[in-house]
Curated annotation (Swiss-Prot):
<dbReference type="GO" id="GO:0002940">
    <property type="term" value="P:tRNA N2-guanine methylation"/>
</dbReference>
<dbReference type="InterPro" id="IPR002905">
    <property type="entry name" value="Trm1"/>
</dbReference>
<feature type="binding site">
    <location>
        <position position="34"/>
    </location>
    <ligand>
        <name>S-adenosyl-L-methionine</name>
    </ligand>
</feature>
<feature type="binding site">
    <location>
        <position position="80"/>
    </location>
    <ligand>
        <name>S-adenosyl-L-methionine</name>
    </ligand>
</feature>
<keyword id="KW-0949">S-adenosyl-L-methionine</keyword>
<keyword id="KW-0808">Transferase</keyword>
<feature type="binding site">
    <location>
        <position position="277"/>
    </location>
    <ligand>
        <name>Zn(2+)</name>
    </ligand>
</feature>
<comment type="similarity">
    <text>Belongs to the class I-like SAM-binding methyltransferase superfamily. Trm1 family.</text>
</comment>
<feature type="binding site">
    <location>
        <position position="128"/>
    </location>
    <ligand>
        <name>S-adenosyl-L-methionine</name>
    </ligand>
</feature>
<protein>
    <recommendedName>
        <fullName>tRNA (guanine(26)-N(2))-dimethyltransferase</fullName>
        <ecNumber>2.1.1.216</ecNumber>
    </recommendedName>
</protein>
<keyword id="KW-0862">Zinc</keyword>
<dbReference type="Pfam" id="PF02005">
    <property type="entry name" value="TRM"/>
</dbReference>
<feature type="binding site">
    <location>
        <position position="63"/>
    </location>
    <ligand>
        <name>S-adenosyl-L-methionine</name>
    </ligand>
</feature>
<dbReference type="GO" id="GO:0160104">
    <property type="term" value="F:tRNA (guanine(26)-N2)-dimethyltransferase activity"/>
</dbReference>
<feature type="binding site">
    <location>
        <position position="257"/>
    </location>
    <ligand>
        <name>Zn(2+)</name>
    </ligand>
</feature>
<keyword id="KW-0820">tRNA-binding</keyword>
<dbReference type="InterPro" id="IPR029063">
    <property type="entry name" value="SAM-dependent_MTases_sf"/>
</dbReference>
Length: 432
């Protein structure tokens, strides 16, 4: 919300106010990003007396000041490389009535010796800052313009045991469909058109897990979200069990018919011929093959909400019911490949669940499902539904309704109309 205070224009978000000028970068589409970050950090550290939070690219200070005002046990370090941004941060800290503040400039060693203030403003390259303070922060929030890949190593050095690494990547187009750039930036080979909005999540978590193993660390995904034009990922960094990286990352054979075949570590023989259509499949990956969310954290956040933020509530409910299988199936795309009319999502879910398979919605794509059913079974259901052959349905035991588990999912209010904000990225403001 924007307003004028005399000659000064301001922007308010929740309880935080910042000044607005021609070089202020504020994207209202990222409010959800900030909202969920507050809730995740609050839930993960609710039993801690104090936590150190790094807002690595603070810009106006909005995100960091919200951490300060909404998480009572936080000590926040608001960093930016730009002097004009640092001046703005200091001004906005005072504007929000935070007097317990300290300014370090580029005195990174002074940070270790201090720590008495709740708000700490720093002027530094964030990679230099994180490298200079090993195992120092409980939370590191990295929200760049573009890729997050170049900051991961430094963040892993600076995060404490069981700290939370919060990553944003706004280059979702690269992660979804630019095969060459994705391989260069994220060291993962992708296939355009396959589970497009979940591929970025499993690509980034895989990259972080592989980088973490170099520092004798492992990762535990807390939440992984593919929202609008960006992805937002929360990872718990555990300073042990680096060997889990081998078990938790897989290559995947992908086919244009949407068949998938996971290749686990140590698998000696690989048949690249598709079992569904007999075409040659394409080798992609590595991808994170484990769960993308910690359901206990999600339930904890849901339990503490008052229901006012319907978009946040709906997306958390989506995450809570998602099954951990790799990727999802877009119903219109599958029906197009089969040359049949699109069927309702609910019919496919009921049929597969009645056949004994796991099914769920996915927050990544509204008209898609997650399931552990093989593509052959999915196609069989789609074809039977399109043909309307009741005798054949009964013969194969396919029922398109009546599954209690799916009924329970259908009864949940997900606020589907709010899943997408309809807003896109903004250009960076001119330099000051």
């Amino acid at each position: 919300m924007e307003s004028k205070d005399g000659a000064r224009e301001t922007i308010s978000e929740e309880s935080t106010v910042i000044t607005k000028n021609e070089w202020t970068f504020f994207n209202p589409a990222q409010k959800f990003n900030r909202d969920i970050s507050i809730e995740v950090v609050k839930e993960c550290f609710k039993d801690r007396a104090s936590i150190r939070v790094l807002d690595a690219m603070s810009a106006t200070g909005l995100r960091g000041i919200r951490y300060l005002k909404e998480i009572g046990n936080s000590i926040v370090y608001l960093n930016d490389i730009s002097q004009s941004s640092v001046d703005t941060i200091r001004s906005n800290v005072l504007l929000n009535g935070i007097e317990d503040a300290e300014y370090f400039g580029s005195d990174l060693q002074g940070i270790k010796e201090s720590g008495n203030a709740r708000a700490n403003v720093v002027k530094s390259d964030c990679n230099v800052l994180m490298t200079s303070l090993p195992c120092f922060f409980d939370v590191i929030d990295i929200d760049p313009f573009g890729s997050c890949s170049e900051y991961i190593d430094s963040a892993l050095r600076a995060i404490r045991h069981k700290g939370i690494l919060c990553l944003t990547a706004t280059d979702k187009g690269v992660l979804c469909s630019n095969e060459r750039k994705c391989l260069i930036k994220y060291s993962t080979s992708i296939m355009k058109g396959m589970g497009m909005n979940e591929v970025p999540l499993r690509t980034i978590v895989s990259l972080v897990s592989r980088q973490a193993s170099k520092f004798d660390c492992s990762v535990e995904p807390v939440m992984s979200l593919s929202i609008d034009f960006y992805v937002r990922i929360f990872l718990r960094i555990v300073r042990r069990n680096p060997r889990s990286v081998v078990e938790r990352n897989s290559h995947v054979l992908m086919c244009v018919c949407h068949n998938l075949a996971e290749i686990r570590s140590g698998q000696r023989e690989i048949d690249s011929r598709c079992s569904n259509c007999s075409r040659r499949m394409r080798l992609c990956g590595p991808f994170w093959n484990g769960p993308l969310h910690d359901v206990k954290v999600i339930q904890g956040v849901l339990g503490g909400m008052n229901g006012g933020n319907k978009r946040l509530l709906g997306i958390l409910r989506y995450l809570e019911q998602e099954i951990p299988t790799m990727f999802y199936y877009e119903i219109p795309r599958l029906c197009s490949l089969l040359g049949i009319s699109t069927i309702k999502q609910s019919r496919l879910m009921h049929a597969l669940a009645n056949m004994g398979y796991q099914v769920s919605y996915t927050h990544s794509e509204l008209n898609a499902i997650k399931t552990n059913a093989p593509i052959a079974s999915i196609n069989k259901v789609l074809i039977l539904s399109g043909a309307g052959d009741q005798e054949r349905m009964e013969e194969l035991g396919v029922e398109f309704n009546g599954n209690e588990g799916v009924k329970a999912l259908e009864s949940i209010e997900f606020f589907k109309g709010l899943l997408k904000s309809g807003m896109g990225p903004l250009p960076l403001p001119r330099k000051h």
